[in-house]
């Protein structure tokens, strides 16, 4: 109990914080995150009203609205798990409607075949009327005093006894027929319905207390299945039923009028009791939907179905109410015909699915959780860490998600996410990707960055506007741009500092020197060094060039010696002649005769390298040149012979 009270205090603390800091987005996100992690139950939502407070935050755009929607979805799932009767209420009401139709269809052939069983039909109609009357006064019974219940039970007892005395003899003869009829009702309506019908059929012989107990239990059972919206429709239908019963009671005597007056007296009490219940708060036994707890304006689907069921129930009621005086046979036959006609009316209606507003069963809570909330204005998911944890991690609900199977869409999303989680291999920066719509300033900046060479005089645009463009410029482009716009030199020193640190790291700035002047000085030194280096390279290239080839004459000033073999033969055969004068001596002799003769060193005496002096060199035997392949083969053979 202490932990529950502590949890309620924590929830109320965050509720007050949300109401107090309605404009602080960070505070609201903090409170929603804390509420998401708390183990809040349905009774906590009822006592504190935090559901209505958080539901009001869904209208806020942005991260707060998304987080509030997620928290409301979680609470809806929690309520659906804790109280499944709320989700199953429409189907139970639908089953009641079907069983009511089968019950009326089972009673119709009995009324056709047994025209004389007027008293038994009247008893069944009165028991039905009592049960419907008990449904309309269900809230009044639980809170009314004992004196009021005694007076009402006494009047009911008198009314029952007057009818019981007249139909006593007929009931004895037709007990077997009633048992067969009860057997049919068991087959059509089930065990629960047959118990109620058997109690209503045996109420003539039972005491006043037993009938009161059966009505009280039935009213409790119906109370669990009806909501606050159904009660209003029951009031409207009961007022319509009063008018129809008053018309039919004109034919009979005063007891039905007395019954109508009692109903009129009870309906305001029911209304006051229902207002008290709604003021006290929502009760789980009332069948209130989770949307009612959150204070939404929309009405649950179960109320529509219950209203249609109540309409069919009131249509199936007999219009002729039984009177205390004995009714004649024609009157009973007419009442049975009216009951037949009224019971056959619902069957002639169109099926519910073919109606203009088809009534479908509500979605399964698990499916409703997976569906996104419908919005006319689509907004992308905000990239806030708190919201992402709430939406994707779902707090501490990992175990619940692991137990269930994935559907096709979830399995596909899981496969894609696992593929993106793999190790990525760097393959360069992706260019040309625009992840978001650029602004006009960004578009203009990109165009100027691509066309820096075309920029000239700007007309006095501030430096901060042009800075993204000038940061992409080279030093030469920046110099040209400053020539057209000298006013930028005062602010562009930051850009020149970047160029100096990039190109001239080893240099130091002199005193009272700007970064622009330092860059220009370093550039001049670099150019001078380059020019000196270029000149030295050119000079070395001139020196290293190959000299011009010169052809020199051999044996110009000396005698030409014959080869040794020739010299031996000349000595052997005695053919050794006089030594021939040297070429130089011959030239000198000729120069004395002819002054135009060439002297030593004259260019005319130069002989080409390829030219051969056939007179000086004896004609030896010409050797035939061997082919390269043959020469190689012979060399190989000589090498083998040497081995």
Swiss-Prot record:
Major place of residence: nucleus
Residue spans of biased composition, Polar residues class: 114-124
The lineage's top-level taxon is: Eukaryota
Against SMART domains, the record matches this protein to:
TFS2N
Q: Where is this region: Interacting with Elongin BC complex?
A: 439-448
Low complexity composition-biased segments: 302-336
Residue positions where Phosphoserine is found in the record: 120
- Compositional bias annotation for Basic residues: 127-136, 238-255
Question: Region (Disordered) spans which residues?
Answer: 86-289, 302-351
Enumerate the residue ranges of region (Activation domain): 413-571
Subcellular localization, as worded in the UniProt entry:
Nucleus
- Pfam families in alphabetical order: Elongin_A, Med26
Domain TFIIS N-terminal: where? 9-82
Keyword vocabulary terms for this entry: Developmental protein, Nucleus, Phosphoprotein, Transcription, Transcription regulation
Basic and acidic residues bias (residue ranges)? 94-106, 164-198, 207-237
Q: Does the keyword Transcription regulation apply?
A: yes
Q: In its UniProt record, which GO terms are filed under biological process?
A: imaginal disc-derived wing vein specification; transcription elongation by RNA polymerase II
Spell out the GO cellular component terms annotated for this protein, sorted alphabetically and separated by semicolons. elongin complex; nucleus; transcription elongation factor complex
The record's InterPro entries line, in alphabetical order, gives: Elongin-A_domain (IPR051870), RNA_pol_II_trans_fac_SIII_A (IPR010684), TFIIS/CRSP70_N_sub (IPR003617), TFIIS/LEDGF_dom_sf (IPR035441), TFIIS_N (IPR017923)
What the entry says about domains is: The elongin BC complex binding domain is also known as BC-box with the consensus [APST]-L-x(3)-C-x(3)-[AILV].
The free-text function statement in the UniProt record for this protein reads: SIII, also known as elongin, is a general transcription elongation factor that increases the RNA polymerase II transcription elongation past template-encoded arresting sites. Subunit A is transcriptionally active and its transcription activity is strongly enhanced by binding to the dimeric complex of the SIII regulatory subunits B and C (elongin BC complex). May play an important role in metamorphosis.
According to UniProt, the name of this protein is Transcription elongation factor B polypeptide 3
> Which organism's genome codes for this protein?
Drosophila melanogaster
What lineage is this protein's organism placed in?
Eukaryota, Metazoa, Ecdysozoa, Arthropoda, Hexapoda
């Amino acid at each position: 109990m202490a932990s529950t009270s502590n949890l309620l205090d924590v929830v109320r603390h965050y509720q007050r914080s949300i109401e107090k800091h309605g404009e602080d987005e960070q505070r609201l996100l903090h409170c929603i995150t804390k509420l998401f992690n708390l183990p809040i139950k349905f009774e906590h939502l009822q006592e504190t009203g935090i559901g209505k407070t958080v539901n009001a935050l869904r209208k806020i755009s942005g991260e707060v609205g998304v987080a509030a929607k997620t928290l409301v979805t979680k609470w809806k799932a929690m309520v659906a798990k804790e109280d499944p009767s709320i989700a199953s209420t429409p189907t139970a009401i639908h089953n009641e409607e079907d069983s009511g139709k089968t019950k009326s269809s089972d009673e119709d052939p009995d009324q056709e075949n047994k025209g004389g069983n007027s008293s038994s039909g009247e008893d069944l109609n009165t028991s039905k009327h009592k049960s419907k009357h008990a449904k309309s006064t269900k809230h009044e019974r639980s809170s009314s005093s004992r004196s009021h219940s005694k007076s009402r039970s006494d009047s009911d007892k008198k009314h029952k006894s007057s009818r019981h005395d007249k139909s006593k003899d007929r009931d004895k003869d037709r007990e077997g027929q009633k048992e067969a009829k009860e057997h049919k009702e068991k087959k059509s309506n089930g065990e629960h319905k047959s118990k109620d019908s058997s109690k209503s059929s045996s109420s003539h012989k039972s005491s006043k207390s037993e009938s009161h107990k059966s009505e009280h239990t039935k009213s409790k059972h119906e109370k669990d299945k009806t909501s606050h919206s159904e009660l209003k429709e029951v009031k409207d239908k009961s007022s319509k039923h009063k008018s129809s019963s008053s018309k039919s009671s004109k034919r009979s005597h005063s007891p039905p009028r007395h019954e109508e007056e009692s109903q009129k007296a009870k309906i305001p009490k029911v209304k006051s009791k229902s207002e008290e219940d709604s003021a006290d708060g929502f009760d789980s036994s009332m069948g209130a939907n989770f949307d009612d707890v959150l204070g939404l304006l929309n009405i649950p689907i179960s109320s529509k179905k219950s209203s249609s069921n109540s309409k069919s129930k009131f249509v199936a009621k007999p219009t002729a109410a039984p009177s205390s005086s004995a009714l004649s046979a024609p009157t009973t036959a007419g009442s049975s015909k009216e009951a037949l006609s009224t019971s056959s009316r619902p069957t002639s209606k169109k099926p519910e699915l073919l109606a203009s507003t088809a009534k479908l069963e509500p979605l399964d809570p698990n499916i409703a959780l997976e569906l996104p909330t419908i919005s006319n204005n689509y907004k992308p998911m905000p990239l806030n860490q708190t919201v992402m944890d709430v939406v994707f991690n779902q707090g501490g609900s990992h175990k619940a998600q692991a137990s269930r199977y994935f559907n096709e869409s979830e399995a596909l999303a899981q496969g894609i996410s696992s593929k993106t989680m793999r190790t990525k291999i760097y393959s360069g920066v992706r260019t040309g990707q625009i992840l978001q719509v650029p602004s006009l300033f960004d578009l203009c900046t990109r165009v100027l960055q691509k066309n820096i060479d075309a920029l000239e005089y700007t007309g006095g645009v501030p430096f901060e506007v042009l800075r993204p463009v000038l940061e992409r410029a080279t030093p030469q482009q920046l110099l040209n741009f400053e020539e057209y716009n000298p006013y930028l030199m005062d602010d562009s020193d930051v850009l020149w500092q970047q160029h100096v640190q990039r190109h001239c790291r080893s240099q130091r700035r002199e005193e009272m020197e700007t970064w622009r002047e330092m860059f220009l000085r370093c550039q001049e030194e670099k150019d001078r060094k380059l020019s000196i280096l270029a000149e030295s390279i050119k000079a070395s290239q001139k020196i290293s060039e190959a000299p011009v080839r010169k052809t020199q004459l051999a044996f110009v000033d000396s005698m030409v010696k014959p080869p040794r073999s020739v010299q031996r033969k000349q000595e052997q055969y005695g053919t050794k002649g006089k030594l021939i004068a040297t070429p130089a001596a011959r030239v000198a002799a000729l120069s004395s005769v002819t002054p135009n003769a060439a002297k030593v060193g004259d260019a005319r005496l130069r002989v080409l390298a390829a030219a051969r002096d056939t007179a000086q060199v004896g004609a030896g035997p010409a050797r035939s040149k061997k082919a390269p392949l043959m020469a190689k083969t012979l060399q190989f053979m000589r090498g083998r012979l040497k081995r």
